Regions:
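Low-complexity, Ser/Thr/Pro/Gly-enriched N-terminal "stalk/linker" regions
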Residues: 1-68, 93-113
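C-terminal beta-rich recognition modules with glycine/proline-rich loops and embedded aromatic residues
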Residues: 5, 11, 280, 346-354, ...
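Well-ordered alpha-helical scaffold segments within catalytic/enzyme domains
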Residues: 13, 73-86, 135-150, 183-195, ...
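Carbohydrate-binding/catalytic loop surfaces
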Residues: 42-61, 110-129, 180-192, 219-253, ...
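Extended ligand-binding groove/face enriched in aromatic
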Residues: 50-64, 70, 79-177, 184-240
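Beta-strand-rich binding/interaction modules
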Residues: 463-486
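Short, surface-exposed beta-strand/beta-hairpin micro-motifs centered on an aromatic residue
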Residues: 506-508
C-alpha cells in the first residue's frame, strides 16, 4: 500500500501524527545529534561522522547504535509524506550523505566495527547486531526512496546487501542473525527493487535458523572475545533451538521473535507458501491466546526481555516492551496478506490503542521501554525484581530502540489500514482518512475510539462490480450497516439486491458502486468487564474494564492516591458514568466513573477484624494515558466485589 495514497484525517490519529511530526521527530533529531540537554547521550550521528572520516573521536553507545539513526530516518520518510518539510528533508539528505561516506569499499556498513574493532567484523553474530543494523537501514532506505524518489541510501544498502549475500549462504559461510531484523529488511528491498537475490537471502536466514542449534556456541569457540557476555547455549533466547517449521511456542526474546515471525509471514504471503504460513499460524495462536497481556503487551519477563510460560502474565513485573507490541502489528499485517481473518486486525487494534501509544508521553518528549499493568511508587523502579518497572517515562535511554520505533509506527499507520485484491477492497481499521485505491477513492470519517460510528464514502474508478470488506472488531456483539441511509441485512436474512455477508470478522458488501455511495456502521460503545483465564493466577478475583478498543487503568491521582484498596462493583456497572474530559492533559478522552468500595483497616499488620468497606466512585482513564500526571499508583486489573 503506497502511503502517498493514504491521508490520515482522524481526530485521534491525526493528533498523534501531528505530535510525532511536529514534536517527536525534531526532539529525537536533537537527541541523536547530542543537542538535547538532560537526556541520555546518543552520539549516533557522530559515530557515522567518525566512521566516514569527517570527525575525530571514539565510538560511543550500544553496539547497535546505528539502528537509532535508521529508524529515525524511516520515520522521517513517512513524515515527509504526511507533512512535506524541505528543511527536514535537506537535513535527512545530509545525514544520508554521511552514512554513504561511512560505507566501506566492500559495501560493509557498521560504525561500531569500522571505528572500534575492524578486525572483528562478522565474528560475533550472536551479540554484535551487524545484520540487525543492516536490516533497519534497509528499511529506512526503502522508505526514503518511496517517499522522496531519492535512491542514494537505497544504493548504499544494495551494496551492503550484496556484501551480505556474498558472505553468507549455501556453499559460503554459514550464519544467522543473533537478532532477527535483516530478514524484514531484505524482503522490503525485494519488494522495492524486484531483485530475487534479496528474497532468496531472507529465506536462507529464516530456514538456516535452528538447523544447527549449536551454531552460536561453535561461533563463540572460534574467538577469544565477547561483547555482552551472552550465553551461546541459551538457544531459545534467539529462537535458534529448532527450525522455523518445528517451532510451535513463542519463546525467547520477544522482539527477536516477532521480527522473525514478520519476515516469515511476508515470505509466506509473497510466495504463497502454505507450509510457512502454517508455521506462522501456530506461533501466532500460541502467542496471542496464551502469552499476551490485555493491553497487547508481549514478553512478560525482564530476564531476557522474553516470553515465559503459558499464562504467566504478572502485572507489576511485566516487561511488555514497546518494540515488541510494534513488532506484533508488523506480524499481524503480514498475516493479513495471506488470510483475511479479523483476529489479526483485532490484534493490531489492541496494540495501537493501548500497548504501543502507552510508550509515549502525551507531550511526545518522554518514553516508556517497559509497559507494566500495575505500578507502585516506592517498589516499582526501586527494589530487586521491579527495577525495570520505571513509574515515570524517561526522556531517552542508552538502549533507545523504542522511541524511534514508535515514530515509524505512527507515521506509517496508513500501511496497516487497507489491502486490495482483484475483487475486494479491505478496510482493517476504523481510522478516518482519504484513500486513493485502485478500484475506488474512499473517504472514511471516524469517531473511533470514543464513539461507535464510522462512514465510508465511495467514489468508484470503474463500472465493474466489486466488494468492500470492512473489519468488524471481535468484541462487537451487534452493529448496524446502512448504504445510503438504507439498512442492510445479512444475506441469510434477505433477498434484497444489496446485502452484506459476514465472514471471519469482516462484512462484505458487493455492489456496482456509484459516486458518493456511503456505507455507515454504527454500534454501541458499552463498558465491558473483562476476566482473565483462571490459569492467569495474577488476575484471579480481578476484572479489567474496556470500552471499544481502549483498555482502562486506575491511577492514584484520581482515587485518593490509593488504587490498591479499591474493589470495583461490577454488579452496579449500569450506574457507571461516562465523561469526556474537557480540559487539561487528558482533554478529549473518555473517562469512566465506576461504583466501588474502598477497604479501610487498622494500623496493625495483621488483625482478626475485617477491613471496613466504604462506598466510593472510582475513576478510570485510558491505559495509554497513565503516567502523565506525576508519580502515581496505577492498576489495570482491579479486585471486584
Amino acid at each position: 500500500m503506497d502511503l502517498k495514497n493514504i491521508k490520515i484525517e482522524d481526530p485521534f490519529w491525526g493528533h498523534m501524527q501531528e505530535l510525532v511530526t511536529d514534536v517527536v521527530i525534531p526532539f529525537q533529531e536533537d537527541v541523536l545529534n547530542d543537542r538535547q540537554p538532560g537526556v541520555e547521550k546518543s552520539h549516533a550521528i557522530e559515530n557515522f561522522k567518525i566512521a566516514a572520516g569527517l570527525s575525530q573521536g571514539e565510538f560511543y553507545g550500544m553496539v547497535f547504535q546505528d539502528s537509532d539513526v535508521a529508524k529515525w530516518l524511516e520515520g522521517v520518510a513517512y513524515s515527509l509524506i504526511i507533512k512535506p518539510d524541505a528543511a527536514l528533508e535537506k537535513r535527512a539528505d545530509d545525514i544520508i550523505d554521511i552514512i554513504a561516506a561511512a560505507q566501506q569499499p566492500d559495501g560493509y556498513l557498521n560504525t561500531y566495527f569500522t571505528i572500534k574493532e575492524p578486525e572483528h567484523r562478522w565474528q560475533n553474530l550472536l551479540e554484535c547486531h551487524e545484520l540487525y543494523c543492516a536490516g533497519h537501514m534497509m528499511e529506512a532506505a526503502v522508505a526514503y526512496y518511496e517517499a522522496t524518489g531519492k535512491d542514494k541510501l537505497l544504493k548504499v544498502m544494495e551494496g551492503m546487501a550484496g556484501h551480505i549475500i556474498d558472505r553468507f549462504g549455501p556453499d559460503k559461510l554459514p550464519g544467522i542473525p543473533g537478532h532477527q531484523e535483516v530478514e524484514i529488511g531484505l524482503m522490503r528491498m525485494y519488494h522495492a527493487t524486484g531483485n530475487e537475490a534479496y528474497k532468496k537471502q531472507a529465506r536462507y536466514f529464516l530456514e538456516e535458523r535452528g538447523k544447527n542449534p549449536a551454531f552460536f556456541a561453535e561461533e563463540a569457540a572460534k574467538r577469544d572475545w565477547n561483547h555482552f557476555g551472552m550465553v551461546p547455549k541459551d538457544i531459545k533466547y534467539n529462537q535458534s533451538h529448532a527450525t522455523i517449521y518445528e517451532q510451535e511456542e513463542a519463546v525467547g526474546h520477544s522482539v527477536r521473535a516477532v521480527y522473525m515471525y514478520t519476515a516469515m509471514a511476508d515470505l509466506a504471503a509473497t510466495e504463497h507458501d502454505e507450509k510457512l504460513f502454517a508455521a506462522c499460524e501456530r506461533l501466532w495462536n500460541n502467542m496471542t491466546e496464551k502469552k499476551m497481556y490485555i493491553t497487547g503487551g508481549i514478553g512478560s519477563t525482564v530476564e531476557g526481555e522474553a516470553f515465559t510460560k503459558e499464562y504467566e502474565l504478572p502485572n507489576d513485573m511485566a516487561y511488555a516492551e514497546t518494540c515488541a507490541s510494534i513488532g506484533l502489528v508488523f506480524f499481524a499485517k503480514q498475516m493479513l496478506k495471506m488470510s483475511k481473518n479479523g483476529k489479526y486486525a483485532d490484534a493490531m487494534e489492541r496494540e495501537l490503542y493501548n500497548g504501543i501509544i502507552s510508550g509515549m508521553q502525551l507531550d511526545g518528549k518522554r518514553f516508556f521501554y517497559v509497559n507494566p499493568l500495575e505500578v507502585n511508587p516506592g517498589v516499582s523502579g526501586e527494589i530487586f525484581g521491579y527495577k525495570h518497572v520505571i513509574p515515570e517515562r524517561p526522556g531517552w535511554y542508552a538502549c533507545a530502540c523504542c522511541p524511534p520505533n514508535l515514530v515509524r509506527m505512527v507515521t506509517s499507520l496508513g500501511r496497516y489500514a487497507w489491502d486490495e485484491d482483484d475483487d475486494v477492497i479491505y478496510s482493517h481499521l476504523f481510522i478516518g482518512q482519504e484513500a486513493r485505491l485502485k478500484k475506488a477513492d474512499i473517504k472514511v470519517v471516524s469517531e473511533y475510539p470514543w464513539k461507535g460510528h464510522v462512514s465510508y464514502s465511495i467514489t468508484p474508478k470503474t463500472g465493474d462490480e466489486f466488494a468492500v470488506a470492512i473489519h468488524i472488531p471481535g468484541y462487537l456483539k451487534s452493529f448496524e450497516v446502512t448504504l445510503n441511509g438504507m439498512r442492510l441485512k445479512e444475506n441469510s436474512e434477505t433477498k434484497a439486491d444489496v446485502f452484506y455477508s459476514y465472514r471471519d470478522g469482516y462484512i462484505y458488501i458487493k455492489n456496482k458502486w456509484h459516486d458518493n455511495d456511503v456505507i455507515e456502521i454504527s454500534f454501541n460503545m458499552d463498558i465491558r468487564v473483562i476476566y482473565a483465564n483462571t490459569k492467569v493466577r495474577e488476575d484471579i478475583g480481578c476484572a479489567a474494564l474496556q470500552r471499544g478498543p481502549v483498555v482502562y487503568a486506575f491511577e492514584g491521582v484520581d482515587n485518593d492516591d490509593d488504587v490498591q484498596s479499591l474493589m470495583i462493583d461490577v454488579s452496579r456497572l449500569n450506574e457507571a458514568q461516562i465523561e469526556t474530559e474537557a480540559e487539561g492533559i487528558l482533554k478529549g478522552a473518555v473517562l469512566l466513573d465506576i461504583p466501588a468500595v474502598r477497604l479501610e483497616g487498622s494500623d496493625a499488620l495483621y488483625s482478626e477484624k475485617p477491613p471496613r468497606q466504604k462506598s466510593v466512585i472510582a475513576r478510570a482513564i485510558p491505559y495509554y494515558m497513565w503516567g502523565n500526571r506525576g508519580l502515581n499508583q496505577m492498576r489495570v486489573w482491579m479486585h471486584t466485589i
